[in-house]
């Protein structure tokens, strides 16, 4: 079983046996991975860069292992022999508790959670039979204190009492588990979470800190999975934005406020927009702790918000940090019409970044930097500064 695997970045047992292919480039040296990603980025953005322009900054990377702060474990097997991990390409249940992307303390806790499921007698959900209860275990780690947010995704309320009975022993053994919740996902589909969240602890949010900015994680709020590189991403955004000395700032798709809060000062009027209400509540708590009074966070669709404004409302600078689909043609048009002095675009999908750049009129790229938040994969984050012509 995976519990006795000794993994190194050169020799991942899961990858070598074909059990997990998530880190498809794990046997490629990090320098080569970065070179390939950099070349891909430069090729994608080539149509938007003048031939003599030196706008690409050196890529930023972090550790090759033990960097990930979130585990999404499918619960497989049976109540007496649960497995936390994935279904391999060959169809077998594979425990990923020893995945080398996780810090060692997180690996140990994942093993303990496997025991917890067994001791509590919670039957894993069987997709093939549409029976069972426990679908996923989601574990998020805060690097600032080593604390955890633990979520059990269940088909129904039937096993909540079993979790509650076994929980005191677990929390006594692991007091660093700060938040525990149950999410109810009754649909027989590959959906990670449902609408209903039930907290089993008094605490409902996990505290994190990047640079000097306090940030908070709630069960449904998006948060970067590579804290070391994410901190550098936010710090770079802060430095780039400060060069414009803006008096007003919009942070669209703001999540828990990471970008806007890093760039804000007591003199900047910041408006943060995010569709997820939980994330907005976290962002507001952070702003209050930082003593920022000229800040407004609202749970709205970013495109709808922008389309409801007119040119007189425009800020000096707009930050966008969209999901993989990008910001879309409608928001591109709104940004072009507002014509702020600059637009800072943080993208987790350079293909949609390039597509959006085709529709943002009247701007040119001045800085582009790659942040390797997802080593061993094809994915990476890009920070791009667009300045008005």
From Swiss-Prot:
The keyword Cytoplasm does not apply. It catalyses: uridine(747) in 23S rRNA + S-adenosyl-L-methionine = 5-methyluridine(747) in 23S rRNA + S-adenosyl-L-homocysteine + H(+). Keywords: 4Fe-4S, Iron, Iron-sulfur, Metal-binding, Methyltransferase, rRNA processing, S-adenosyl-L-methionine, Transferase. The keyword Cytoplasm does not apply. CDD domains: AdoMet_MTases. The active site is at 348 (nucleophile). GO terms for molecular function: 4 iron, 4 sulfur cluster binding; iron ion binding; rRNA (uridine-C5-)-methyltransferase activity. SUPFAM superfamilies: S-adenosyl-L-methionine-dependent methyltransferases. S-adenosyl-L-methionine binds at residues 224, 253, 274, 321. GO terms for biological process: rRNA base methylation. Gene3D superfamilies: 2.40.50.1070, Vaccinia Virus protein VP39. [4Fe-4S] cluster binds at residues 12, 20, 23, 99. Its EC number is 2.1.1.189. Catalyzes the formation of 5-methyl-uridine at position 747 (m5U747) in 23S rRNA. Belongs to the class I-like SAM-binding methyltransferase superfamily. RNA M5U methyltransferase family. RlmC subfamily. This is 23S rRNA (uracil(747)-C(5))-methyltransferase RlmC. It comes from Shewanella sp. (strain W3-18-1). The gene is rlmC.
């Amino acid at each position: 079983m995976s519990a006795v695997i000794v993994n190194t970045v050169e020799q991942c047992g899961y990858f070598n046996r074909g059990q997990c292919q998530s880190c498809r480039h794990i046997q490629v040296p990090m320098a080569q991975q970065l070179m390939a990603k950099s070349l891909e980025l430069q090729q994608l953005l080539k149509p938007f860069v003048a031939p003599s322009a030196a706008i690409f900054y050196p890529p930023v990377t972090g550790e090759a292992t033990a960097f990930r702060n979130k585990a999404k474990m499918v619960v497989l097997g049976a109540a007496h022999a649960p497995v936390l991990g994935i279904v391999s390409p060959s169809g077998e249940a594979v425990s990923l508790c020893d995945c080398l992307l996780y810090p060692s303390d997180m690996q140990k806790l994942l093993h303990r959670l496997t025991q917890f499921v067994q001791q509590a007698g919670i039957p894993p959900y069987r997709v093939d039979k549409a029976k069972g209860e426990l679908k996923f275990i989601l574990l998020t780690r805060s690097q600032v204190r080593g604390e955890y947010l633990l979520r059990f995704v269940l088909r129904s309320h039937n096993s909540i009492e079993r979790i509650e009975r076994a929980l005191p022993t677990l929390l006594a053994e692991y007091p660093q588990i700060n938040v525990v919740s149950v999410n109810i996902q009754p649909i027989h589909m590959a959906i990670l979470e449902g609408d209903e969240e039930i907290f089993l602890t008094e605490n409902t949010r996990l505290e994190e800190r990047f640079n000097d900015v306090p940030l908070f994680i709630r069960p449904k709020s998006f948060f970067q999975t590579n804290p070391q590189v994410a901190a550098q991403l936010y710090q770079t955004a802060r430095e780039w934005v400060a060069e414009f000395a803006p008096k007003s700032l919009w942070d669209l798709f703001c999540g828990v406020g990471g970008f806007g809060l890093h760039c804000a000062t007591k003199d900047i009027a910041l408006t943060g927009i995010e569709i997820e209400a939980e994330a907005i509540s976290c962002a507001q708590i952070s702003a209050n702790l930082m003593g920022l009074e000229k800040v407004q966070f609202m749970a709205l669709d970013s495109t709808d918000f922008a389309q409801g404004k007119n040119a007189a409302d425009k800020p000096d600078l707009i930050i966008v940090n969209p999901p993989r689909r990008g910001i879309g043609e409608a928001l591109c048009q709104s940004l072009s019409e507002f014509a702020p002095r600059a637009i800072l675009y943080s993208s987790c999908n350079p293909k949609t970044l390039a597509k959006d750049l085709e529709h943002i009129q009247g701007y040119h790229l001045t800085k582009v930097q790659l942040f390797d938040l997802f080593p061993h994969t094809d994915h990476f984050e890009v920070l791009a500064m667009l300045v008005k012509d």
